[in-house]
A protein has these predicted regions:
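Re-entrant/interfacial helical elements at transmembrane boundaries that shape
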Residues: 1, 17-35, 233-244, 261, ...
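Membrane-interface alpha-helices at helix entry/exit sites of multi-pass transporters
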Residues: 1-9, 38-46, 250-255, 284-299
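Hydrophobic alpha-helical transmembrane segments of multi-pass integral membrane proteins
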Residues: 1-6, 179-180, 209-244, 248-249, ...
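Helix-loop-helix module between adjacent transmembrane segments
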Residues: 3-20, 52-55, 182-190, 224-230, ...
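Short amphipathic alpha-helical coupling elements at transmembrane boundaries
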Residues: 4, 44-47, 160-171, 197-207, ...
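Long, contiguous bundles of hydrophobic transmembrane helices that form the permeation core
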Residues: 36, 41-45, 58-131, 139-164, ...
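Helical membrane-embedded segments and adjacent short helical loop/helix-boundary regions
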Residues: 51-55, 108-120, 137, 166-179, ...
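Core transmembrane alpha-helical segments of multi-pass membrane transporters/permeases
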Residues: 129-152, 159-196, 211-223, 227
Length: 300
C-alpha cells in the first residue's frame, strides 16, 4: 500500500506541476511541433492541466484509499489482512529489490541531528548546480562532504563510512539492472516503431468521429504505454502525429494533447517495468511484480 501511494504521487503529480521536468519537456515539444511559441509554451501546458484526467483521478483514488473510502482490493486486500494478522509487511521476495538493505535491522542511533540530514541534501543540490547540473559530480562531492561532516564529529568511523558506501552500492545493484533492462526494452520498442505503427493503423478511422478522438488517443496510447513503458518516448513519437491530425479532422487539439500526456502518466504509473514503478518498489522495499499487480485495480 505504501508503494502504491508513493507511485501514485510521483508521475501524476509531476504532470500537474508547471515547474516539473515533465512540464518543461512537454512544453518544449509543444514548441517543436508548432502548437505555441517559445515564450507561451508553459502557459499552453498549464491549459492542459485541468484536462489531464488520469493524473487527477490517480491522486483522488489514492486519497480515498488512505481515508478508506475505497477499501483495499485484490492483492492489496490480501496484504492488508496478512499484516493485520501479524504477518510480514512486505511480500516474499521483496528483500531482493529493497534498497534499504540491512539498515532496517541496524541499531538506532540517537546522536544524529536533523542538520546531519539537511546539510548533505543541500550540498547535493548546490554542488550539482555548480557542476553544470552533473549529478555524478554532485554525488561524489556530497559523499566527501558527508565523510568530513560525520567522521570529524565522531558520528561514524572512517571504516564504517566506507562499508556503508559499499553496502549502498550493493543494495542498488538489482534495481539498477532492472532499470537498464527496462530502458533496453523501451529502446527496442522505439526502434521497431511499435507506437507509431499502432497510431498509423488506428487513427485514420477517426476522421468521421473527431469528438471521440481524445478518448481513443488515451485508450490506444495507454495500451501501448502499458506494454512498452516508454513514458517520455511516447510524447516524442505521438505528439508530432496527434497534433496535425487533430487539427486536420477538426478535433479539439488541447484535449488531444492532454490525452497524450495522460497516457504517458498512465504508462509511468501502471507499467511493471517503468522507471517510476521500479524506483517506488525499491524505495519502499516491496517486490516489483507484487506492487504492479496490487495497484492494477486502482490504476485501471
Amino acid at each position: 500500500e505504501l508503494t502504491y501511494i508513493v507511485d501514485s504521487t510521483a508521475a501524476p503529480v509531476c504532470v500537474l506541476i508547471p515547474i516539473s521536468t515533465w512540464a518543461v519537456f512537454a512544453s518544449r515539444l509543444l514548441v517543436t511541433n508548432g502548437v505555441t511559441t517559445e515564450g507561451e509554451s508553459l502557459k499552453y501546458f498549464i491549459k492542459t492541466i485541468p484536462y489531464n484526467f488520469y493524473a487527477w483521478a490517480a491522486l483522488i483514488i489514492v486519497l480515498l484509499l488512505i481515508l478508506r473510502v475505497i477499501p483495499p482490493l485484490g492483492r492489496m486486500k490480501v496484504a492488508t489482512e496478512r499484516v493485520e494478522n501479524g504477518g510480514p509487511l512486505a511480500p516474499a521476495g521483496s528483500e531482493k529489490i529493497d534498497i534499504r538493505g540491512n539498515s532496517k535491522n541496524a541499531e538506532p542511533q540517537t546522536h544524529g541531528k536533523m542538520i546531519d540530514f539537511a546539510l548533505p541534501i543541500a550540498c547535493l543540490i548546490l554542488s550539482t548546480i555548480l557542476c553544470d547540473v552533473d549529478m555524478q559530480k554532485g554525488v561524489i562531492i556530497t559523499l566527501g562532504f558527508m565523510f568530513v561532516l560525520y567522521v570529524s564529529r565522531g558520528l561514524i568511523s572512517a571504516s564504517d563510512f566506507a562499508d556503508c558506501c559499499v553496502e549502498g552500492i550493493k543494495n542498488m545493484l538489482l534495481p539498477l539492472i532492472m532499470m537498464v533492462l527496462a530502458f533496453l526494452f523501451s529502446y527496442a520498442s522505439n526502434r521497431i516503431q511499435f507506437t507509431k505503427t499502432i497510431i498509423d493503423t488506428v487513427f485514420p478511422f477517426m476522421q468521421n468521429i473527431p469528438q471521440l478522438m481524445p478518448l481513443f488517443i488515451f485508450i490506444i496510447l495507454g495500451i501501448t504505454e502499458f506494454i512498452t513503458g516508454t513514458n517520455w518516448g511516447l510524447y516524442i513519437i505521438a505528439l508530432p502525429i496527434v497534433i496535425p491530425l487533430s487539427a486536420a479532422i477538426g478535433a479539439n487539439t488541447l484535449l488531444c494533447i492532454s490525452a497524450v500526456l495522460s497516457a504517458g502518466v498512465f504508462g509511468s504509473h501502471i507499467c511493471f517495468y517503468s522507471d517510476a514503478t521500479i524506483i517506488s518498489s525499491s524505495a519502499c522495499g516491496c517486490d516489483n511484480f507484487e506492487h504492479g499487480l496490487s495497484q492494477m485495480p486502482y490504476g485501471f
